[in-house]
């Protein structure tokens, strides 16, 4: 309610007695009028011209399109490139420390935050931008190919140049000690880190981008991981071993399948019925325990007949055991004991015949088969039975087709063969012999 309606006399404000304390929020900023004469710098405007004439002259004056106005103040452009913000893709966004002036790229924001958390020490450190540009190139000393990651270079040195990075002998044998620092340094001598390369690497041809191929059997695989597993069939490497028996295999899935046999060895299990049919469910051959022995320690007849003191140990990928397994009666490679071999001509007669009757179900894993011969071969992966043996080396397998494929590595056909100078084992390819020398005779190579 106002003072008039309340019956009160409105308070009168005396401008002479009013002070700044009563009206503290009232601030008046009075600017002087713009002197248009100072803007009139053209020769067509006189200095002593009245202001009204100057306004009229400016309104009626016409200037060309795009010409700079004489009334607007012109700001000088900076000649320094650092004072101007670039807007091109060649100059990315940067993060600058306000204390030490260190520059970080926008992608290194984590490093910028760590730099601020450490108190921004005024030290001369390397520039992250220059470090990101100086990418080190990994190149092979033998062929000069460059790679972006150490793993790709290691795979290239292993498959293309035969660099052996795995231990092919069993760990329990005294002839297979762990590699020392000198051996590791000698093995990694083919890998080097070279200086940064200024120019771009040459484009990779289509032949270099082809799928990995096995040097032994010339089989092409889809990836290096599949090639790695496939090479174990030639080298005899069995990195997965059972902790309850001497079973060893090349794939982890086969080891998991083998462990199911130990769970079914209780009385009344299906394994007892398998043993009643003449199949040994839990009697896998002993793993690889042989070592390369000098030719002088072996009898001449044993060397001539066996002829595989340090064979490449070619094995099937799913065979339970290593490449030194020669089936029942195999004492050990390099031992003077006589090893009985199966005549390759009589393989078909001595090998068990395949029955093509109705199939059945596996007692170990429950897998069903429509053909009894396939069930018999599959059951051997659980029992470790390998009736097909090679007469040139301790290789043994569960299928005759795999034995025939293995025999090609020895070059037993009509083609030319090469023999190992130390153990007289024949090979059909020079690459197979070279791999055999590196793995079985490293001190003589």
Swiss-Prot record:
Q: Where in the cell is it found?
A: Nucleus
Where this protein primarily resides, as one coarse class?
nucleus
Q: Which GO terms describe its biological process?
A: negative regulation of transcription by RNA polymerase II; spermatogenesis
Q: Name one GO cellular component term.
A: nucleus
Which domain of life does the protein's organism represent?
Answer: Eukaryota
Q: Where is the composition biased (Basic residues)?
A: 1-10
Q: Where do the ZnF regions (C2H2-type) fall?
A: 138-161, 212-234, 240-262, 360-382, 388-410, 418-441
Care to name a GO molecular-function term for this sequence?
sequence-specific double-stranded DNA binding
InterPro entries given in the database record? Dev/Hematopoietic_TF, Znf_C2H2_sf, Znf_C2H2_type
Tissues in which the protein is found? Strongly expressed in testis and embryonic stem cells.
Where is there biased composition of kind Gly residues? 320-332
Q: Where is this cross-link: Glycyl lysine isopeptide (Lys-Gly) (interchain with G-Cter in SUMO2)?
A: 31
Q: Where is the composition biased (Basic and acidic residues)?
A: 338-351
Q: Where is this region: Disordered?
A: 1-20, 62-88, 256-359
Q: Where is the composition biased (Polar residues)?
A: 269-278
Q: Which keywords describe this protein according to UniProt?
A: Isopeptide bond, Metal-binding, Nucleus, Repeat, Transcription, Transcription regulation, Ubl conjugation, Zinc, Zinc-finger
Assembly? Interacts with KLF4.
Q: Which family does it belong to?
A: Belongs to the krueppel C2H2-type zinc-finger protein family.
Q: What does this protein do?
A: May be a transcriptional corepressor with KLF4.
Under what name is this protein listed?
Answer: Zinc finger protein 296
Q: What species was this sequence derived from?
A: Mus musculus
């Amino acid at each position: 309610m106002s003072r008039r309606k309340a019956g009160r006399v409105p308070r009168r404000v005396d401008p002479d007695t009013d002070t700044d304390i009563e009206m503290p929020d009232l601030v008046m900023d009075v600017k002087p009028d713009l002197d248009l004469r100072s803007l009139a710098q053209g020769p067509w405007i006189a200095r002593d011209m009245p202001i009204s004439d100057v306004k009229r002259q400016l309104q009626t004056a016409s200037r060309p399109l795009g010409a700079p106005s004489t009334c607007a103040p012109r700001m000088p452009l900076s000649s320094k490139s650092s004072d101007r913000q670039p807007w091109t893709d060649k100059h990315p966004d940067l993060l600058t420390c306000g204390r030490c002036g260190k520059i970080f790229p926008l992608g290194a924001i984590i490093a910028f935050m760590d730099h601020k958390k450490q108190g921004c020490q005024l030290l001369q450190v390397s520039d992250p931008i220059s470090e990101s540009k100086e990418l080190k190139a990994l190149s092979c000393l033998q062929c000069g190919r460059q790679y972006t990651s150490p793993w790709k270079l290691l795979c290239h040195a292993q498959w293309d140049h035969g660099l052996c990075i795995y231990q092919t002998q069993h760990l329990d044998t005294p002839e297979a000690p762990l590699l020392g620092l000198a051996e590791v340094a000698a093995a990694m001598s083919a890998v080097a880190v070279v200086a940064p390369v200024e120019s771009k690497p040459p484009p990779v041809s289509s032949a270099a981008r082809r799928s990995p191929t096995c040097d032994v059997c010339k089989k092409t695989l889809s990836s290096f991981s599949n090639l790695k597993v496939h090479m174990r069939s030639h080298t005899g490497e069995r990195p997965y071993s059972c902790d309850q028996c001497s079973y060893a295999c090349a794939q982890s899935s086969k080891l998991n399948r083998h462990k199911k046999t130990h769970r079914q060895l209780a009385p009344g299990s299906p394994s007892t019925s398998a043993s009643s049919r003449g199949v040994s469910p839990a009697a896998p051959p002993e793993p690889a325990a042989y070592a390369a022995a000098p030719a002088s320690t072996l009898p001449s007849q044993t060397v001539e007949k066996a002829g595989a003191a340090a064979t490449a140990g070619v094995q099937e990928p799913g065979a339970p055991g290593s490449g030194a397994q020669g089936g029942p009666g195999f004492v050990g490679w390099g031992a003077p004991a006589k090893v009985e071999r199966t005549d390759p001509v009589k393989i078909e007669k001595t090998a068990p015949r395949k029955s093509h009757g109705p199939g059945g179900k596996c007692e170990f894993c429950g897998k069903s088969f429509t053909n009894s011969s396939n069930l018999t071969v599959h059951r051997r992966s659980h029992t470790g039975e390998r009736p097909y043996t090679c007469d040139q080396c301790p290789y043994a397998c569960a299928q005759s087709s795999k034995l025939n494929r293995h025999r090609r590595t020895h070059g037993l056909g009509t083609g030319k063969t090469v023999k190992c100078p130390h153990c007289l084992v024949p090979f059909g390819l020079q690459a197979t012999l070279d791999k055999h020398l590196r793995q079985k005779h490293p001190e003589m190579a």
